[in-house]
């Protein structure tokens, strides 16, 4: 073992036995000169931190109370450090071997030289130091005589020194003495007697110096503990000092710290009031040298004499009354400097020292009682046999183990009475004290006595653990965890021997609280106080209790968060005995702010708590039904109480500012009691002593002391439902479905339902890819409900033959996945595929009777869509999300009999954001932010974040609208129910305000088993709650009771058995759209290429075509005639209103360029703008319309025909199809294309800078279905339209369908014609959204006539809006990847947006389509019949067009 740094321990001991004769270091002092220079290197390698020049003054100080280091001319020392004589003898043997005298001389000179070297930095002319140790060869002499001789020798030497002006020069004299009997560590009375004895011994010497030496600053230095330490740690060859002052009390760490402080205070009080400090030229200051109460086991190798010199110097730099006095590792190598404000050596006067009166900051209380109001105080009807059904009144015995906080040290001490901290007020102890009653003294024992007045084992009054009044409070002051096993053995022995209790039958509460002292000493011995060792010590003690004590409930209180103690210690306005604090807890209070050592301590504190928790959670102490250990974590996060002024409130502490005051004991008792009633997993982990809370009461719902098993907050759940029977016969209606009727369970969704990362351990990021399907909240079936809470495990409590659930781990294709068909990362667009697979599995698996078994299918989707929405906001729009979800549910509705579908909302992405942002250390930001970039990367208050929130709300709204449409309530054996428990979700928060990452997988995105458990409980609760009253908020940390069906309400709830009426949607006021695009800027300069054309570059808009472009009948209710052309509402050219009220292509473009020209308004010809369409137009009219349009453009003065970019939309062919039956040759596909080509040629020759939309004609097959009598077909159509005359002729209808397809196919080739690709500023792009046109259906699946005007022929405003949206979206889709169908569903957010990556309108070239196709078709067209369409546009539309055409022709 290495020795402590500084003077060698042999040397120190020799120093303490100083030899004879004054000695001064001079260059001519013979052999005595060279030897010390060889032995002591003093401050040669020491970095001097002070800046003397800043403190220099030219005038020498006249007062000792303003004495600066630069004023000192000489350093000297005298002393006697021998053991005091035996009582009554008055003498000490001073004889020492001659060989030691030389070494003693060297040690003394070395220390004085080091001190002199320090002063030399301030005053280079300081003289060589002087040592005047005792004679040692004069035989027997008293200590007083020896000191007298030294003093006289010193004075003589000073007077004879020619370099010293004895009268004017300032001298620094150090008087060394010892108190090696350690009487200063005894009780106050003994200490005072011994102190007076020493004072008498030294008074003569000090009086002599005071009288004889002018201008002197005298240090009175007690090196008692330095000597004791030397004797304890190194063999010196000398006999240890005899114990001549045996203390009446045992010396403990606490008593030693208190007595050290008291000893120093006594010396300072004596000296401050003495005559030695009443003059201007002389002062005596006491400098104590106390060692740390616990020294490090390993210390640096011995250094030179600088250590002791530095300590003397540093003490001189500290104001009297604020000297800490202890030697500690942190200060052994540091030097303090005079400050600008206090550049002098500190005396009692310039320190403003007053006799210490320690007063607490805050209001002191001698006692603190609490009002007890719990109504239910009865015990169990019979003595319980299980600890998990233990009521407070069942407790008959109480006990405790721990340290001084449980022993009650200082709990009842009055303010300022530091010595009384040694008194153990066990009757006031928070966990086991039993003084008085709850009304005056609040303790756990007194709380329990309100339930059972016959409680035994509590401690009363004061005394140590071995006194009768301590009873079963076996806490030992100063104890560490390695002493806990001995306490456990003693407690067991006491209980067994106590005749007043029944050891075998009585229920016992034992509270264990330990660890503060371990932390306080941990930096000095990391092996002894490591977290693992600490936990092992606790385990040893708990093992003893577990093995020996029947019927016991053990509170294992987490070690307290100890660093807040620093706030009290570091606040100068708070009066605390800091020397005691540093002695008791050096490893907390001796560390620098923001130091690595402090960070290590904080981490060690946390590990103590964490490892203790793991020990308890291991289940090691839950193997017997009559014994458990419960972790009570209320001290894990402690807030320092503060006064109204914001200062640390010392009234909560004993006079030593370390132990608890009675007020804190009271509030700790209430906190412990609250913890005991709180469920495991939901216990308070935060303690604010400032707040006095009432005593919590058990209730009928939770009457028992909480254990792991009765808390229902592990991953398992207890089921206490009584109504578990199935229906008398299998129900035929989903509205009379009981839980026990469910025979099959299945699930669809993404990573959450697939179970990714559910059981992954913290930090194991790679394991997140593991799919723990058996633990999935909606589909998992691992183990049983008491171990794993999932929906299937709940349903298995009702029907043990349930099938379909997944077990273990594996992907979607594994056998263990069964009917859990969720796929990690799946999006809404993948849902239909999952549905198809699920249906096929259910049909093919023999365990499932597809037609007879009742099924619960849970669907959860959307989170993955939001993770990627910003990458392609068009693809992941709310409209598309709704469409995909509807398609999947439609398949289930159509294909699956006897099914109840749970549609579960996705978790709001803001939760994931908060977890990431507030836990950057725990969450792997760099690795996983890529997986959910659109959620995790937007800045706070950014536009991107606002868009995320808007998309989230739109997704949720679309789910609600879809279900409440009633679309899935048309069959008696099928229903979709929205389970909204995730609609509003609260972030699980720890007591310190940080998100609780234990609810999440290691990636902080997916959910842990803890969260899945809560999801399962919440889903089950929702399934039993009626519509309109379902829980729509989830706090993962709250206790969710497992609901039960009842006799009155035995069914899983649907809209019908909830007597719920879906809310009637408010009438839609307009068919406008919301504009969410952010990329709106035009090109930096006007583009010269049509392939780099942005929407904002468009200056002119125009259109040509037939009645669809004139918008005839779009708003017939506002006109007396159905023939009115509402050009201002036309899909491709109308400009009435704004986009928010009317969705048209120009209104969309106005968002990019408000100055756009050419759009139509109103109904009059003169406001048609550049809309040249005619109602009855056919393809043959297109060249004429093209000429008219060119003429209009050229004659419009506001249009720059050469520079402005123009957008022309052409749609024709409806009337051609109508007349094809009469004249197939003239209305052939070839003729149709020829006329359109001619019109395009005109534009090609006449107009620069043009982008032309050629829209394919509508797909018109599958017509003439029944319309329910709402749109009876006029007889004129049937009589005059040759096509429809043969509508019953299958061959004729096939021919019509073929021609329709040929027209579309022919137009589709136009985009690739070589002719139209020769100019850089000209492009023709075919927009195919009408190729496959779905019949518009309402929310219940019926024909939706709101798309048409009252004649069921013309498009209504809504129909035009849908066409405008479809056209715009086609324009932003690459050629070859354009949407070829129109989705007639209402959503205000269906408009796509250009993006920074793809800002241009798409042409063949910028779509990266190979130009070979265009070259192939430059001269020859190849016709192809398109694939048969999905369905017709609307019933009767072709007939009406034919009728209309005939009428016009006639």
Swiss-Prot record:
Question: Do you know which Pfam families this protein is assigned to?
Answer: Lipase_GDSL (PF00657)
Question: Residue ranges under compositional bias (Polar residues)?
Answer: 708-720
pH behavior is given as: Optimum pH is 8-9.
Give the PROSITE patterns listed for this entry: LIPASE_GDSL_SER
Gene3D superfamilies hit by this protein: SGNH hydrolase (3.40.50.1110)
Q: What class of enzyme is it?
A: hydrolase
**Topological type in the membrane:** Single-pass type I membrane protein
Places the protein is found:
Apical cell membrane
Give a short account of its post-translational modification: Undergoes proteolytic cleavage in the ileum.
Expression by tissue, per the entry, reads:
Expressed in the ileum mucosa, Paneth cells spermatocytes, spermatids and sperm (at protein level). Expressed in the ileum, jejunum, esophagus and testis.
What name is this protein filed under? Phospholipase B1, membrane-associated
Q: Which domain of life is it from?
A: Eukaryota
Q: Name where the sequence repeats lie.
A: 41-351, 366-711, 712-1058, 1068-1407
**Annotated region 4 X 308-326 AA approximate repeats: where?**
41-1407
